[in-house]
Amino acid sequence: MQQDYLSQQRFSDLSLHPIVRDTLAKKGFDFCTPIQALSLPISLNGRDVAGQAQTGTGKTMAFLTATFHHLLTHQDPNLEYPHPRALILASTRELAVQISNDAEFLAKACGLKTALAYGGDGYDKQLQAIERGVDILIGTTGRVIDYVKQGVIGLDEIQVVVLDEADRMFDLGFIRDIRYLLRKCPTPQVRLTMLFSATLSYKVRELAFEDMNDPEYIEIEPEQKTGHRIKEELFYPSNQDKMALLLTLMEDEWPERCIVFANTKHRCEEIWGYLAADGHRVGLLTGDVAQKKRLSLLKQFTDGDLDILVATDVAARGLHISDVTHVFNYDLPDDREDYVHRIGRTGRAGESGVSISFACEEYAMNLPAIEEYIGHSIPVSQYETEALLELPKPYRLKRAVPPQGHTRHRSYHTK
């Protein structure tokens, strides 16, 4: 993490439980990020907080640190807790899994058990883990409600509630589910509630604050919505040139770790086919991909076994993937906020990144709203049609996927 990205607030100077403080120190957490520096003094004192900051600024560690501290300082050694004491709700199952992974080192050091509850698969496995005992339940609203209604878990011992990517949960229509679960917990006055998100509209704050106890609202205002370390670039390709331009730019940029976003599953499959045929180590992440496959793809991408991930917006929110060097908007998103969320995959934690967008015949109409929202025009670049790569015959999903270890090659072309 870049030093100029951090604040002057040290974790060691905060009123942290010794186990949490020492564990963070062993993991190399010395200085807080700005959102951590502002939120932790509030949450460590048991006061509710709603924090807004750009993706990749340390929101997850902000609420995990406060959660473990609160549980350690509010436990009775003479009591056994048969039900969860903390509930962390995420907008997607991938985000829930990543939060669980991030919490693992703290859970081990603190002697607290975490468990996952999300839809898609693993119902019995998740159930068995919960029945073995859980202190911190991390999941999505639907599966958690299932377990509550079945009597598998009770929420009457909850001491901490976290809503992560809160605006996304509201956008997805989870407001009734959230309220159902919060009403099953102890009242806001006797629990700690934390709400974090990259964007937080007034409407969302108003809805969420009904179930919080006089929360303090904090915001880390970026220099610009898209992050000043992200180099943005815009092309105006014809529909005929669009795919060839993508492949050509891939060869020119040669990204170490890249996400390509498109607006539909069909378009993502098409992009995957051409990139795979061109010899790239590429994975496909859409809503139709089975849960186990999705998690496997994310792990391969994170571990560096895949260089490119082609995704719909299901992957745009909450995924904590470090070292993404490039983001391609093959299609400009219909929702202007999704542009910010997409390119927020790169330029994280003080690193630099590149965002390249195509304003094609179909989606160029989305550009004015995006530029109005981000507060600046995206620099335009030109290309020469005759310099574009010739398209290979694309792979189709019904054909065997090339081995993940397939070596990428460079195609040579005249610029």
Curated annotation (Swiss-Prot):
Segments passing through the bilayer: none
Family under the similarity heading: Belongs to the DEAD box helicase family. RhlB subfamily.
Function noted in UniProt: DEAD-box RNA helicase involved in RNA degradation. Has RNA-dependent ATPase activity and unwinds double-stranded RNA.
Main EC class the enzyme belongs to: hydrolase
Any Pfam family: Helicase_C
Species name: Haemophilus influenzae (strain PittEE)
Annotated localization: Cytoplasm
Coarse class of the protein's main subcellular location: cytoplasm
Segments forming domain Helicase ATP-binding: 40-218
Protein name per UniProt: ATP-dependent RNA helicase RhlB
This protein's record includes keyword Transferase: no
Database matches in InterPro entries: DEAD/DEAH_box_helicase_dom (IPR011545), DEAD_box_RNA_helicase (IPR050079), Helicase_ATP-bd (IPR014001), Helicase_C-like (IPR001650), P-loop_NTPase (IPR027417), RNA-helicase_DEAD-box_CS (IPR000629), RNA_helicase_ATP-dep_RhlB (IPR023554), RNA_helicase_DEAD_Q_motif (IPR014014)
GO molecular function, one term: ATP binding
Residues annotated to bind ATP: 53-60
Segments carrying motif Q motif: 9-37
